[in-house]
């Protein structure tokens, strides 16, 4: 009778299911690469065949052809430094999320200024002391007038643009 005394050796090998999960994760990462913009792809440490395959992916329109191409990208991903790719993608996602959060905060400021009157204007000037209060009040008044007369929101866009410029100046982006 053969007895197994070396239990650690039994668990060192990956199961077939674990290998499949890892390969599917590589395919998912490869599919995520196909959604990135070309200038972001240039920053990734990809081999030439993988870069070409990722750039060729949008050409495959049919479902089966696209699926097959994603599987091919997953196969090419096996030879890549996946950690570096994941790190850069997470960095891009984080910066995009931060940009969107800041954008929505500025939209809320615009809406508060147009709806809120002097109290909202005072709060805004407290947050952005470099603001030209008279100019902003004029822009807000025009936006309120447009909203009251159901006109296109051109002045509201000008308010947003001015707020965005102030925010970029405050954050040192201008």
UniProtKB/Swiss-Prot annotation:
Keyword field: Cytoplasm, Ribosome biogenesis, RNA-binding, rRNA-binding
Main location: cytoplasm
A Pfam family: DarP
GO biological process entries: assembly of large subunit precursor of preribosome
Taxonomy, superkingdom: Bacteria
Cellular localisation: Cytoplasm
InterPro entries: DarP, DarP_sf
GO molecular function terms noted in the UniProt entry: ribosome binding; rRNA binding
GO cellular component, one term: cytosol
Sequence intervals crossing the membrane: none
HAMAP family noted in UniProt: DarP (MF_00765)
Entry similarity comment: Belongs to the DarP family.
Protein purpose: Member of a network of 50S ribosomal subunit biogenesis factors which assembles along the 30S-50S interface, preventing incorrect 23S rRNA structures from forming. Promotes peptidyl transferase center (PTC) maturation.
Protein name in the entry: Dual-action ribosomal maturation protein DarP
Species of origin: Pseudomonas paraeruginosa (strain DSM 24068 / PA7) (Pseudomonas aeruginosa (strain PA7))
Gene name of the record: darP
